[in-house]
Amino acid sequence: MSNPKQLTFPWNKYNKSSFDSFYASKLNKHLLSLLQNNTFKDDLLIFGTKDSGKTYLLQALCNYFSNQGKSSFYLPMKQAKELSVDILESLESMELVCIDGIESIVGNKVWEIGLFNLINRSLNSENRLIFTSSKNIDVMNFELKDLDSRLRKIQSHELYALADDEILSALKHIANLRSIELGSKEAQYLLTYANRNISDLVQILESLDQLSMEMKRKITIPLIKEVI
């Protein structure tokens, strides 16, 4: 198989995900510190709810590696499993492999074996594997017991979703990083009337920023009403 970074996949697209723009709550600061520690090279299994930011974090980690001139590969398992399991071949040659959503292949014998084989090959290389899942390994129930055993030996960390009282701080943090002027009243209005999912809020924020520039208007509550 060709070097993975030479191939084009439907999920490969430029993104600006970065650790700086990931709002780290108190509960997540230790995990963020581990991921940015170049001397910490253990494999990790990160689990958390749908809205905890697992995908963003993996993409930020890949960008972090790329910015240091290191090879990285991001694989969203839910999409990848529709392709041939051969996609896993040679991934151990990458310095970092991030596999997102491994719960998607529970019960899929071919993919469970493929993932198990990748982990085994990686034991003999210097690459690093980072997995994410919406569930703790204790409740995933992989049919391949050898895979289950391998994953249980990997250090696991929970990525906690933002608490309600942290969402406002996160929204302001992201707005400041992107030089978007968002007043306190406007931010509070967004939290009151829009979906409080941080990824949805960021999409709304980006739409507001674009619209405000096109209309040469500040982001106000009337403008927010036009978007949401």
Task: Tell what function each PLM region has.
Residues 40-58:
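Walker A/P-loop nucleotide-binding motif
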